[in-house]
């Protein structure tokens, strides 16, 4: 017998939960469109190589990967940024830069399901391609602040920020190849500090200022102050390192000016392999997972064979944001009128339908009654379901050109002209 449960790690949503998801999406869309971002829609199914080219074959264990009927190895997308880069390379390179893109869509990861972690979930995000200015990083962070302020979560979240470019510069100076770099960053992302230190011990034999600095970042990055980090970076005589810390300091100052709570964690890295500069995550103090994240990725377009195109972006987890809203006790039940139109006999159905259409055109949620039971039993049924008004149509109403309105909240009934119907429905309940 077929199971009625959704697949493990996937969820069904109905009514209020669906409304919350759409509400989050709508607020996100309005926020980013006002900032000049244009929507992109890409397929859920992509060539597996699109993700493995930068992320490596080990991604296979955390993805839905399969062969299609043409024996092509394809995957359900685990994120959307690579798809946006593919779209850019395929058809958007001629657009003026910077190019501002946003997306909303479902993604799939074969993770072990747990609180806040799903195998199917929704992401909404932005990508800004074609600018290496720190102003681009500030723009997307400001946009993130705008969105969470719009949905009344700004004062309940905090940003964790760093600049992964600091690690990249040090690793490059130490001549670590890309595979070693990504492995070290993966270990740091997973909190496996001792394993990372072991690799560094094997590869760095001297006791240079660079070695001291990287060990300080790994073991003491969270508590390391930017001013202290700047002094230590200057000792390495790597000017690029100083520049990256200065960029991070500017971002922190901008976030402070926006009154957005944040911490600078110089040991913080993110798991995605393509980040090259400032990175960030949004956390809520009472949740064990982040609800959004992003950063700069200046080399990803080149990885896919394009010209160097600096880029920065972020993605929010829609279900995680919904969880944060629910956990905070924010209610979404609408106080808008909910109307049922009752035709007392079949001869007045055309007139009842015209009333239904008129009310829907005016923006009211309106249904045509299809319960063929006495009116005396309809009233309590609709009241129990949360309806606010019954519009009753019979031969008497047709003849008089009026309608009978039953207010289920105030338990009152009046007769009114059709042209006054919307005013009667929207009158406040005292």
UniProtKB/Swiss-Prot annotation:
Gene Ontology molecular function terms on file: ATP binding; histidine-tRNA ligase activity
UniProt-listed Enzyme Commission number(s): 6.1.1.21
One Gene Ontology term from the biological process aspect of the record: histidyl-tRNA aminoacylation
This protein's record includes keyword Protein biosynthesis: yes
Enzyme class: ligase
Catalysed transformations (reactions): tRNA(His) + L-histidine + ATP = L-histidyl-tRNA(His) + AMP + diphosphate + H(+)
GO cellular component, one term: cytoplasm
Subcellular location: Cytoplasm
Keyword terms: Aminoacyl-tRNA synthetase, ATP-binding, Cytoplasm, Ligase, Nucleotide-binding, Protein biosynthesis
PROSITE patterns: AA_TRNA_LIGASE_II
InterPro entries named among the record's database cross-references: aa-tRNA-synth_II (IPR006195), aa-tRNA-synth_II/BPL/LPL (IPR045864), Anticodon-bd (IPR004154), Anticodon-bd_dom_sf (IPR036621), His-tRNA-ligase (IPR015807), HisRS-like_core (IPR041715), HisRS/HisZ (IPR004516), HisZ (IPR004517)
Family: Belongs to the class-II aminoacyl-tRNA synthetase family.
Protein name: Histidine--tRNA ligase
Biological source species: Metallosphaera sedula (strain ATCC 51363 / DSM 5348 / JCM 9185 / NBRC 15509 / TH2)
């Amino acid at each position: 017998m077929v199971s009625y449960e959704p697949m493990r790690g996937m969820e069904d949503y109905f009514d209020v939960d669906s409304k919350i998801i759409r509400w989050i999406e709508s607020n996100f869309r309005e926020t980013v469109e006002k900032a000049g971002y244009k929507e992109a829609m890409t397929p859920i199914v992509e060539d597996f190589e699109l993700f493995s080219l930068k992320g490596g074959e080990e991604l296979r264990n955390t993805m839905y990967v399969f062969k299609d009927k043409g024996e092509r190895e394809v995957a359900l997308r685990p994120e959307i940024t690579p798809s946006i880069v593919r779209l850019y390379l395929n058809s958007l390179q001629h657009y003026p830069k910077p190019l501002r893109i946003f997306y909303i869509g479902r993604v799939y990861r074969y993770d072990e399901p747990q609180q806040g972690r799903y195998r199917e979930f929704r992401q909404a995000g932005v990508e800004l391609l074609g600018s290496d200015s720190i102003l681009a990083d500030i723009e997307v962070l400001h946009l993130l602040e705008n969105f969470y302020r719009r949905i009344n979560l700004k004062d309940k979240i905090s940003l964790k920020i760093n600049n992964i470019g600091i690690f990249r510069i040090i690793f490059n100076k130490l001549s670590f190849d890309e595979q070693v770099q990504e492995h070290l960053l993966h270990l740091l992302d997973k909190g496996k500090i001792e394993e990372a230190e072991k690799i560094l011990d094997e590869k760095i034999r001297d006791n240079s200022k660079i070695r001291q600095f990287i060990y300080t970042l790994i073991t003491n990055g969270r508590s390391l102050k930017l001013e202290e980090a700047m002094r230590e970076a200057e000792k390495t005589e790597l000017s690029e390192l100083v520049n990256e810390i200065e960029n991070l300091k500017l971002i922190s100052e901008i976030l402070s000016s926006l009154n957005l709570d944040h911490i600078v964690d110089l040991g913080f890295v993110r798991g995605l392999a393509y980040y090259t500069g400032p990175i960030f995550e949004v956390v809520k103090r009472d949740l064990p997972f982040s609800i959004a994240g992003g950063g700069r990725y200046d080399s990803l377009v080149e990885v896919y064979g394009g010209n160097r195109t600096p880029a920065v972006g972020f993605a929010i987890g829609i279900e995680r944001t919904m969880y944060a809203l629910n956990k905070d006790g924010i209610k979404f039940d609408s106080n808008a009128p909910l109307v049922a139109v009752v035709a007392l006999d079949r001869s007045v159905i055309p007139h009842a339908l015209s009333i239904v259409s008129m009310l829907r055109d005016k923006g009211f949620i309106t249904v045509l009654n299809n319960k063929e039971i006495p009116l005396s039993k309809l009233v309590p049924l609709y009241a129990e379901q949360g309806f606010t008004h019954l519009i009753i149509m019979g031969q008497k109403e047709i003849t008089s050109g009026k309608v009978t309105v039953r207010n289920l909240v105030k338990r009152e009934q009046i007769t009114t002209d059709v042209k006054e119907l919307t005013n009667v429905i929207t009158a406040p309940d005292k």
